[in-house]
Swiss-Prot record:
Protein name listed in UniProt: NAD(P)H dehydrogenase (quinone)
Listed GO MF terms: flavin adenine dinucleotide binding; FMN binding; NAD binding; NADH:ubiquinone reductase (non-electrogenic) activity; NADP binding; NADPH dehydrogenase (quinone) activity
InterPro entries cross-referenced by the UniProt entry: Flavodoxin/NO_synth, Flavoprotein-like_sf, Flavoprotein_WrbA-like, FMN_Rdtase-like_dom, NQO
Record-stated family: Belongs to the WrbA family.
Organism: Syntrophus aciditrophicus (strain SB)
Keyword NADP found: yes
Pfam families the UniProt entry points to: FMN_red
Domain (Flavodoxin-like): residue spans on this chain: 3-194
GO cellular component, one term: membrane
Alphabetical UniProt keywords: Flavoprotein, FMN, NAD, NADP, Nucleotide-binding, Oxidoreductase
């Protein structure tokens, strides 16, 4: 069984979550986990100006995803930073190129799940994931979130991401807050949970 983790990350926050998601999925027996980045759409000059180009070098080793690869997976976990309460433009551009897969129903019946990062505590974590689900539903995917059996999302002793819709983190307005132990645990749980659900469906 093959699980793909497909994401976009600017400063590395979503990348950290993606690693935790992949680790969780890989804990399930007979699961192949593949990590992929979606293509960058911003010009290099701008990326350098805002510090993204340098930050992305830390995970430049992760191969860029080809649209056709999605068809080979049994489950796909998508990671995106929030942009005004929606997925980022890079992810939107990538998904807009999946029309050919949609036309032949290539993703119908596959498991889909989403995780995210926002700049602020109420910066659109839930709306980003929920609006992302619309695209997955158009593809006929089976949506899996982060159930309350991950008890870390009920904590009130610290500021934390994660909701029943998916794992998340808060980067901070200066992008200087990194995923906490609890947020990474949520991402790990989500990866493992998706792999378990996919296993029940496809093995």
């Amino acid at each position: 069984m093959k699980i793909m983790v497909v994401y976009y990350s600017a400063y590395g926050h979503v990348h950290r979550l993606a690693e935790a998601v992949a680790e969780g999925a890989s804990e399930i027996v007979d699961v192949e986990v593949v990590m992929r980045r979606v293509p960058e759409t911003l010009p290099e000059a701008l990326l350098k100006k805002i510090g993204v180009f340098e930050a992305q070098q830390a995970f430049a080793h992760v191969p860029v995803c080809e649209v056709a690869e999605l068809e080979t997976a049994d489950a796909i976990l998508f990671g995106t930073p929030a942009r005004f309460g929606n997925m980022c433009g890079q992810m939107r551009s990538f998904l807009d190129a999946t029309g050919g897969l949609w036309a032949k129903g290539a993703l119908v019946g596959k498991v889909g799940s989403v995780f995210t990062s926002t700049g602020t505590q109420h910066g659109g974590q839930e709306s980003t994931i929920l609006s992302f689900h619309t695209t997955l539903l158009h593809h006929g995917m089976i949506i899996v979130g982060l159930p309350y059996t991950f008890q870390g999302q009920s904590r009130n002793d610290e500021i934390t991401g994660c909701s029943p819709y998916g794992a998340s983190t808060i980067a901070g307005s200066a992008n200087d807050r990194w995923p906490t132990e609890n947020e990474l645990a949520g991402a790990n749980f989500q990866g493992r949970h998706v792999a378990c659900i996919a296993g029940k469906l496809f093995q």
